[in-house]
Amino acid sequence: MINIRKTHPLMKIINNTFIDLPTPANISSWWNFGSLLGLCLIMQILTGLFLAMHYTPDTATAFSSVTHICRDVNYGWIIRYLHANGASMFFICLYAHIGRGLYYGSYAFQETWNIGVILLFTVMATAFVGYVLPWGQMSFWGATVITNLLSAIPYIGTTXVEWVWGGFSVDKATLTRFFAFHFILPFIIXALAXVHLLFLHETGSNNPTGIPSBVDKIPFHPYCTIKDILGALLLILTLLTLTLFXPDLLGDPXNYTPANPLXTPXHXXPEXYFLFAYAILRSIPNKLGGVLALLLSILILXFIPMLHTSKQRSMXFXPXSQXXFWXLVADLLTLTWIGGQPVEHPYXXMGQLASILYFLLILVLMPMASXIENKLLKW
């Protein structure tokens, strides 16, 4: 009997992606984050869809419509907070996924890695425009500050900012277009994720040793499906705990004040997941320089395959590279903390040091550590 799972054009794709996919036998829990990101995306699209049914993208009613969702819509409060905290979970999974790729040398799959970098930019753009929609103080001023960065571009800057705003300030037109972007981008992300997966399945997954694992493969189902379900349950548990016990833990109190163009909040600061980039932006005294550093802090990921000097793919057996990697993680956590602090004496200088260290680690120290290891191993 011919198995429909393996012959039907549509079922065949699903089968080769989630069922009969040959998977390395030794991949660790760090390989769970890909499926968790897929789960996050589906969850965000679904909660977002239900929020969009009750939201009005208009300066006069946006803030009230969010309040209406929380108070009058059945289970609106949980949909709203799942969506807001789901974004934080999305970024936690995203950074873990990228960290895994850096540590185990998964960036050697160049197409997969480059599409991943594009995905990161798209998700960041989506999160930014989404944060503007509730039209609170932080939404409004966040939009003003970040879109204003375009004005740092020489000659065309000012025109470009007014073009993005659709006027001479962040106003009705800006909110409406941001809602349109926020609605369309997740579907673009879904398409890009499929392409990301397509390129990954051309080569097969990497594994913790960084050695080709064609000799030792297992079917994805049931081994990895059950493992992914466990990861998903832990993700849902974390998200629900956060949403039901401390929904405003990661939010900003200033966003419970309706947007007012005449009064600036004490400290404009982005959401938890953008603080490291914000700290890098702030640490450079020049506007254009700051914008370039901000862009480069993410774009640098695309250059990592070119900076790989080691004769080994993974960092699993390379202690000096590990030290540099964990120093980078600590540096990013430091930047995240500083991004949330006011621009005062100790923080300003610490932010500058942490920003310099960030680029130094990636561009100089990590490639150097790999070169030293090669020498020590007489390779």
Curated annotation (Swiss-Prot):
According to its UniProt entry, the protein's GO biological process terms are:
mitochondrial electron transport, ubiquinol to cytochrome c
Cofactor(s) essential for the protein: heme b
Q: How is the cofactor bound?
A: Binds 2 heme b groups non-covalently.
Identify the main location: mitochondrion
Tell where it localizes: Mitochondrion inner membrane
Q: Domain of life, per the record?
A: Eukaryota
Q: Which InterPro entries match?
A: Cyt_b/b6_C, Cyt_b/b6_C_sf, Cyt_b/b6_N, Cytb/b6-like_sf, Cytochrome_b, Cytochrome_b_C_euk/bac, Cytochrome_b_N_euk/bac, Di-haem_cyt_TM
GO cellular component: a single term: mitochondrial inner membrane
The terms under GO molecular function for this entry are: metal ion binding; ubiquinol-cytochrome-c reductase activity
Cross-referenced Pfam families, in alphabetical order? Answer: Cytochrom_B_C, Cytochrome_B
Any idea which positions bind heme b b566?
Answer: 97, 196
Q: Per UniProt, where does a ubiquinone bind?
A: 201
Membrane-topology descriptor: Multi-pass membrane protein
Q: What keywords are annotated for this sequence in UniProt?
A: Electron transport, Heme, Iron, Membrane, Metal-binding, Mitochondrion, Mitochondrion inner membrane, Respiratory chain, Transmembrane, Transmembrane helix, Transport, Ubiquinone
Q: Where are the transmembrane segments?
A: 33-53, 77-98, 113-133, 178-198, 226-246, 288-308, 320-340, 347-367
Q: How does it assemble?
A: The cytochrome bc1 complex contains 11 subunits: 3 respiratory subunits (MT-CYB, CYC1 and UQCRFS1), 2 core proteins (UQCRC1 and UQCRC2) and 6 low-molecular weight proteins (UQCRH/QCR6, UQCRB/QCR7, UQCRQ/QCR8, UQCR10/QCR9, UQCR11/QCR10 and a cleavage product of UQCRFS1). This cytochrome bc1 complex then forms a dimer.
The family classification in the record reads: Belongs to the cytochrome b family.
Function field: Component of the ubiquinol-cytochrome c reductase complex (complex III or cytochrome b-c1 complex) that is part of the mitochondrial respiratory chain. The b-c1 complex mediates electron transfer from ubiquinol to cytochrome c. Contributes to the generation of a proton gradient across the mitochondrial membrane that is then used for ATP synthesis.
Q: What is this protein called?
A: Cytochrome b
Give the species: Tasmacetus shepherdi
